[in-house]
């Protein structure tokens, strides 16, 4: 569970992981019921924040729901090795939803972890720029530490107002299969909990 406090010490958000790992010790946990966003007032202004925890990032729907609920920044506490494919998931969640994704991970001194905390700002193109840019604005190493990244929220908002990803051209009426609860081969698992 993630608990987010604002700079004044007020609890703003409590989020319980929706996608618990049914194939491991997390099978004994109760999954969360929903994804939430909250307006977080910072010294630089307000930003709409949501959260996913670790395995939630494996499901594009997690970030998409948060985007639809207004998230501009998704916080992602993590506890597993951050390798190229997991980093690619985070980059994709930021790109496809035009939002920032900030991940903190346990350092390499913790078993089965390797640090690699990151921030993707979600802005793939800059006005007047030539081609796309790398949205990764922070990639930490394996050591324990406090890592800071500057997120230009106004730039993100301008980008969201002009570009084509996110909710700009979706056709949700054609996505009925996404809410179908049936699971077919080859994806049936004995450990799955609905």
Predicted features by range, described:
Residues 18, 78, 97, 163-166:
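Alpha-helix boundary/capping residues
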Residues 57-147:
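CN hydrolase (nitrilase-like) catalytic-core segments centered on the catalytic cysteine
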Residues 1-69, 78, 82-92, 113:
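Active-site catalytic loop in hydrolytic enzyme cores
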Residues 107-194:
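C-terminal beta-strand edge segments of enzyme domains
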Residues 2-4, 13, 29, 40, ...:
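Generic detector of leucine side chains in alpha-helical contexts
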